[in-house]
């Protein structure tokens, strides 16, 4: 509506005529319309809400708050008695929220982040009545970096200053500046409601064809044509490169480049790190790469409502400045081995992958350590006996390191890591001699004390070394009766009598004892 028509609506009538004024939420302000005597309140309000599906702010209709209802009623009778009619049951008053949420708490913060960058004002230095959520602001800044509006240290670029002057979301502004007028049709579709009925399929090219073929309702087509004309005037006319529909949408949604996951289901990982899925049987369900412009907003795995296919070469051309090769060593749970890869990455998606042939031993060992934590520690009998000896003395009060399996896994980076050189698989780990690694945990003095108080063997009067079994709580040995002849003092191990099981000449247990002679 033109400004003069708006002025005429609120000017007093001089000839006594009655008039009807349709007003937005501006009527909740201190605006006085002198001859208004009656207010009819629908109980609804239009609010700016961040639409997680489109990644932009949308206007949605919600229940008004009690505070808004009071303000609206106050427009009647500003200078004379008046009446307010509320189009809801009186009993519903208690269900209305007390106040409307601050827009900064619910809207997309991309525009705010861009304005703050233009001002050069750090958000934390501004006295917001309702400060923006740090996570939401950070997400907005990351998007602006992808759009080339901010530098890595969050400073505004010349491109960002230009986007800030455009009367539309930075996503669409960036697309129109990079692609030019050719993007005005798809920008108009992205900036309005879906022109096709639900169930028509996700492919955005269907929307473009419907607009061009005249298969849309007259009002919808007129609205889109009007929006297309408006956006053509905002587009840069310096771009002459012809781009596919997928490439143009990718300019607006660099965080929504989707790569199909392995498997039969049409599930995708997006360059921004989130997951999304197409409906089974959708025309795009076999596409290896897509650009997603609208979802249902599910934070776990969103259902894709609008998307378009894009080629790998197009992705590499459009985002050459954001694509990088990354090297990684990771433990593969499926392969039970360390996998060293060089990956061509755009955010969270992998465009190409190769074997990292010259991965450093330190990186491989660190990845193997993650495998150890997943697999657990499997000790051989000698390793288990040593560990048990230390634990037995520690439980008796000796100042020794904790060698429980839980503690050993938690501290593996300090004692096991140096011994993992050359170990890459679960089979190699199983064959690794851990005894030396376990012994390295003790100082020389601690090692001597363990050997003295909890020896690995005892020597009989006949001179034979018998291994001590520490795995059953109380240290014990088994030997033939004759080998104890000449014993005058019962052996003490770990501060307690050694349990001796005497065997017959045939090797059968005769008697366990802790008191010889």
PLM feature spans:
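Second RecA-like catalytic domain
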Residues: 8, 40, 48, 88-432
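Ser/Thr-glycine-rich phosphate-binding loops at phosphate-binding pockets of nucleotides
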Residues: 20-29, 42, 74, 157
């Amino acid at each position: 509506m033109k400004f003069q028509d708006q002025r005429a609506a609120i000017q007093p009538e001089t000839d006594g005529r009655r008039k009807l004024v349709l007003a937005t939420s501006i009527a909740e302000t201190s605006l006085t319309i002198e001859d208004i005597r009656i207010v009819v309140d629908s109980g609804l309000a239009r609010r700016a809400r961040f639409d997680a599906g489109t990644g932009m702010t949308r206007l949605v209709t919600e229940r008004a708050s009690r505070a808004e209802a009071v303000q609206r009623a106050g427009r009647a009778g500003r200078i004379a008695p008046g009446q307010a009619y509320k189009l809801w049951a009186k009993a519903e008053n208690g269900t209305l929220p007390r106040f409307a949420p601050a827009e900064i708490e619910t809207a997309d913060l991309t525009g705010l982040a861009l304005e703050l960058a233009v001002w050069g004002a750090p958000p934390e230095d501004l006295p917001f009545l309702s400060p923006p959520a740090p996570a939401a602001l950070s997400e907005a800044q990351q998007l602006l970096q992808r759009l080339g509006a901010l530098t890595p240290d969050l400073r505004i670029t010349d491109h960002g200053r230009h986007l800030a002057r455009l009367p539309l979301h930075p996503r669409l502004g960036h697309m129109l500046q990079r692609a030019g007028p050719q993007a005005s049709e798809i920008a108009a579709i992205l900036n309005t409601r879906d022109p096709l009925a639900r169930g028509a399929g996700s492919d955005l090219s269907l929307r473009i064809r419907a607009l061009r073929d005249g298969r849309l309702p007259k009002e919808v087509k007129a609205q889109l044509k009007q929006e297309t004309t408006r956006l053509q005037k905002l587009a840069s006319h310096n771009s002459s490169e012809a781009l596919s529909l997928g490439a143009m949408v990718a300019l607006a949604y660099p965080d929504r480049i989707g790569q199909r996951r392995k498997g039969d289901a049409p599930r995708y990982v997006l360059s921004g790190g989130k997951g999304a899925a197409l409906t089974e049987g959708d025309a795009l369900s076999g596409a290896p790469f897509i650009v997603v412009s609208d979802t249902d907003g599910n934070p776990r795995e969103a259902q894709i409502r609008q998307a378009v296919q894009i080629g790998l070469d197009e992705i590499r051309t459009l985002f050459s400045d954001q694509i990088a090769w990354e090297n990684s060593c990771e433990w593969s749970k499926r392969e039970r081995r360390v996998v060293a890869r060089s990956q061509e990455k755009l955010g969270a998606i992998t465009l190409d992958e190769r074997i990292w042939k010259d991965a450093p031993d330190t990186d491989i060992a660190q990845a193997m350590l993650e495998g150890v934590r997943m697999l657990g520690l499997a000790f051989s009998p000698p390793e288990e006996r040593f560990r048990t000896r230390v634990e037995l003395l520690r439980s008796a009060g000796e100042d020794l390191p904790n060698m429980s399996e839980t503690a050993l896994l938690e501290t593996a980076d300090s004692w096991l890591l140096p011994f993992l050189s050359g170990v890459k698989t679960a089979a190699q780990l199983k064959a690794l001699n851990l005894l030396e690694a376990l012994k390295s945990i003790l100082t020389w003095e601690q090692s001597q004390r363990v050997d003295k108080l909890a020896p690995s063997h005892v020597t009989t009067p006949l001179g034979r070394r018998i291994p001590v079994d520490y795995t059953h709580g109380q240290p014990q040995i088994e030997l033939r009766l004759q080998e104890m002849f000449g014993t005058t003092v019962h052996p003490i191990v770990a501060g307690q009598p050694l349990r001796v099981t005497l065997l017959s000449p045939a090797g059968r247990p005769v008697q366990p004892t802790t008191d010889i002679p």
